[in-house]
């Protein structure tokens, strides 16, 4: 399943943001340049972790899925756990078998998950770079502008999020962001090789 806040907090408490060995070189530089010490919207006050949510600041829900992390953070966490991020193809196959639990913003959601969370409310980072599918030919007009020019230095996220319109949501829906971005509803799933 998705990495929980509790699981990620172990990484934070173990000095995951102070140890370069689990970070990609570019990620380590980004993290140091921007003084990143925890997921976006987390903060520590009066010996307790809090998180800014869509309904304001609240104590960090340790059982909830982790949200608002960059590719760099996701990759460092996976390395720390002795795992890796799934490929785009692995995650698509996995998501087809999962039950969709939608709770879209338009339906009054105040948080990107609920107690029976499966997928559909958080994007999940993959290790796959955003590149065209085999046989891809750019369309003329606006779609060419949207797809073709962005296939550089971006990583694929899968699964949809609470801000994904129902008409767009499907198991094969791809999103992509630069590896330092973490403002979107992004979470982590881990993968291991069978051998």
Predicted features and spans:
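Residues within well-ordered beta-strands of beta-sheet-rich folds
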Residues: 80, 114, 189-191
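Surface-exposed recognition segments
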Residues: 5-6, 12-36, 118-195
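Short, well-ordered junction/capping motifs at the entry into regular secondary structure
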Residues: 63, 99-119, 175
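Short amphipathic alpha-helical segments
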Residues: 96-97, 101, 191-195
């Amino acid at each position: 399943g998705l990495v929980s806040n509790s699981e990620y907090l172990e990484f934070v408490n173990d000095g995951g943001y102070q140890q370069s060995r689990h970070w990609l070189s570019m990620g380590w530089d980004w993290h140091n340049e921007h003084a990143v010490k925890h997921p976006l919207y987390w903060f520590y006050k009066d010996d307790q972790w809090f998180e800014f949510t869509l309904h304001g600041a609240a104590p960090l829900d340790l059982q909830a899925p982790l949200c608002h992390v960059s590719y760099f953070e996701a990759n460092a966490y996976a390395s720390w756990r002795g795992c890796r991020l799934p490929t785009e193809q692995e995650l698509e196959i996995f998501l087809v078998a999962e039950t969709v639990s939608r709770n879209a913003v338009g339906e009054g959601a105040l948080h990107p998950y609920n107690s029976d969370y499966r997928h559909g409310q958080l994007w999940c980072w993959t290790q796959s770079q955003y590149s065209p599918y085999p046989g891809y030919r750019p369309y003329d007009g606006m779609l060419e502008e949207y797809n073709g020019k962005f296939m550089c230095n971006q990583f694929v996220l899968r699964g949809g999020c609470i801000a994904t319109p129902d008409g767009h949501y499907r198991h094969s829906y791809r999103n992509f962001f630069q590896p330092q971005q973490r403002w979107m509803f992004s979470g982590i799933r881990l993968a291991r090789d069978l051998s």
